[in-house]
UniProtKB/Swiss-Prot annotation:
Principal EC category: ligase
E.C. numbers: 6.3.4.20
This protein's name: 7-cyano-7-deazaguanine synthase
MF terms in GO: ATP binding; ligase activity, forming carbon-nitrogen bonds; zinc ion binding
Binding site for ATP: 8-18
Length: 219
């Protein structure tokens, strides 16, 4: 039996969520998904490393059908990842159809199986503009569906839903989280590219202009 199942991508948001959950004294396991994204090969090792550091059980679930059947520039074989800010129309190409719904459903089933009372996802207020399955309306409806579908045994929670990514970065710093052990860049190169929307957001969140960001960028 465990308190929480954390959906851990290996990115900064879910890493902070993991650290904060453990600081609260909860027991936790992490679940990650290999769904064929261009940055899975960079993110997943970060997730593995975080779980080893925090000494928690970690499951990686392979979802090859997403890469095979779905269309998104975020997926291997998709069009090129666009540069620019999240607010731009072209960033909608990075939406992976119903990704969070699929992952949360699996996490909820796993949580019920191991008698964990909650599933935690690190989506934040800045995700809402582009990604339909990060919006409060979706989160609330899906949480209710899981509550009904598990007969009240599993709650889906979004602790950072009212926070900005910068808020999350600041919280992680108070937790002494090493952000060099997290991955954000959508392009999945050896280093963070520094120009895609995800990198732009990371730079702002980690206060790069103030010299507080430990990330190594190409640009």
């Amino acid at each position: 039996m465990v308190d929480s199942i954390i959906v851990l991508s290996g990115g900064m948001d879910s890493a902070v969520l993991l650290a904060q959950t453990l600081k609260e004294g909860k027991t936790a396991q992490a679940i990650s998904f290999d769904y064929g994204s261009k940055h899975n090969d960079r993110e997943l090792p970060m997730a593995v490393g975080l779980c080893e550091e925090f000494a928690i059980k970690h499951q990686i679930i392979k979802l090859p059908f997403i890469g095979e059947l779905f269309s998104s520039s975020l997926l291997t074989g998709g069009e090129e990842i666009p540069d620019g800010a999240y607010g731009q129309e072209n960033m909608k190409s990075t939406v992976v159809p119903f990704r969070n719904g699929i992952m949360l459903a699996i996490a909820a089933g796993y949580a019920e199986s191991v008698q964990a009372g909650e599933v935690l996802l690190g989506s934040h207020s800045g995700d809402h503009h582009i990604y339909p399955d990060c919006r409060p309306e979706f989160n609330n409806a899906f949480a209710e569906a899981v509550n009904l579908g598990t007969d009240g045994q599993v709650a889906i929670r979004f602790p950072f839903s009212e926070m900005t990514k910068r808020d999350i970065g600041d919280l992680g710093r108070t937790l002494d989280l090493d952000f060099a052990k997290t991955w954000t860049c959508y392009k999945g190169g050896e280093l963070h590219c520094g120009v895609c929307a995800a990198c732009d957001e990371r730079k702002e969140a980690l206060r790069h202009p103030e010299g507080l960001d430990v990330t190594k960028y190409l640009v």
